[in-house]
Amino acid sequence: MAYTTLKNLGIKSPYKEKYDNFIGGKWVKPVDGRYFENITPISGKPFCEVARSNEKDIELALDAAHTAKDAWGKTSTTERANILLKIADVMEQNLEIISLAETIDNGK
């Protein structure tokens, strides 16, 4: 199937053609190796492929969350707040890329 690319739309793309799951701080291929096409309403064509996760992937994510919960629970509220503020700063620095992704995904 022909893919819609930002290049086809005259825009330089900061995005990958395929996205895996983000589990335990790293990108992980779906256990069954399956992906689905993310269709953009702009053209009705696939924009990228995204991991088609299932219960096995969810179990891996839950295991990672359970592993991280103890350390997070021991983190002071001040340090947690600083981490969340850093996340907000990174999102703000990448607002154009995020809004472009939302536009492509939603068609407006």
Regions of interest found by a model, annotated:
Residues 46-108:
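Glycine-rich loop-to-alpha-helix module at the N-terminal edge of alpha/beta enzyme cores
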